[in-house]
Amino acid sequence: MAKVKFFKTNSAWGLEREVNEFIQNKNVINISYTVAECGYGYIHCCCVLYRE
């Protein structure tokens, strides 16, 4: 069964580190990434679809 993990941060570098640590030893199906401008900066979001 597939699972989804959602990440959100205000740092692209922090998001990349978190996602890279998470996907180790996972069977990744898809990774989607988006960035949105907010009044105070940017929000970086990533959604990982995977199987354990």
Model-derived regions, located:
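Short linear sequence elements within intrinsically disordered, low-complexity coil regions
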Residues: 11-12, 27, 38, 47
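Acidic, metal-ligating active-site segments
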Residues: 41-52
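Generic structural motif recognizing short loop/turn segments at the entrances and edges of beta-strands
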Residues: 1-3, 25-31, 45
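Short amphipathic
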Residues: 2-10
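A solvent-exposed interaction/effector surface
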Residues: 34-41
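A short, charged, amphipathic alpha-helix used as a generic interaction element across diverse proteins
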Residues: 13-34
